[in-house]
Amino acid sequence: MQSTNKELFRSSVSESLKSTAPLMGKSVYEQNLNKIRNSDVNLSSFAFIFSELIQRIQSQVSGIQEFEEKLNEHGYRVGQKLVELVVWRERNPKRETRILGILQYIHSSVWKYLFGKHADSLEKSKEASDEYMIVDNNPLLNKFISVPKEMNQLNCCAYLAGIIEGFLDSAQFPCKASAHSVPLSQYPYRTVILIKLDPSVIAREEVLG
């Protein structure tokens, strides 16, 4: 069964690897951080690495909740470093102090930085003043992963939720972020990243007016 699941995870990645040429030239470690500002990661390379991460976590966990928690932890570390990198590359970095400002920045600039496009929408919860939602109709992280039947409730965008949580925590907007599948007929992988802000953030926002 473990072998079959690994093949399921690999199958869609293999097709991508066949059709995309490998990276050429210098290693990313040899390049100047500013000179590669507009460079893209080879899609097949990313798909392969992410698939390997999924398989590694799968061998360590016993259920979907634990699986998504592990994905979130890995993404969180990326989000922490992403703040530093974005600030380093910004020509005129601005520190966001308001909730809407930082979330709009993530919805547009950070999403484009990560995936080459803006997120599809940013929404505020009508039920809770401390909750916001970022929606991606066709998330890249779910595109190359075929989930086994017994894990059909798994959403690999838990990794993305971790990135957002790490980014916001490092930007002094502590929160909890989670990924939720909300499919539509035309968008079967549609995912909502639910962001629940820490009470201290809400209190600060009220002071700022």
From Swiss-Prot:
CDD domains: TRAPPC5_Trs31 (cd14943). SUPFAM superfamilies: Ligand-binding domain in the NO signalling and Golgi transport. It is found in: Golgi apparatus; Endoplasmic reticulum. It comes from the Eukaryota. GO terms for cellular component: cytosol; endoplasmic reticulum; nuclear envelope; nucleus; TRAPPI protein complex; TRAPPII protein complex; TRAPPIII protein complex. The keyword Cytoplasm does not apply. It holds the Pfam family TRAPP. Disulfide bonds: none annotated. GO terms for biological process: endoplasmic reticulum to Golgi vesicle-mediated transport; intra-Golgi vesicle-mediated transport; intracellular protein transport; macroautophagy. Keywords: Endoplasmic reticulum, ER-Golgi transport, Golgi apparatus, Transport. InterPro entries: NO_sig/Golgi_transp_ligand-bd, TRAPP-I_su5, TRAPP_component. Part of the multisubunit TRAPP (transport protein particle) complex composed of bet3, bet5, trs20, trs23, trs31, trs33, trs65, trs85, trs120 and trs130. TRAPP plays a key role in the late stages of endoplasmic reticulum to Golgi traffic. Belongs to the TRAPP small subunits family. BET3 subfamily. This is Transport protein particle subunit trs31.
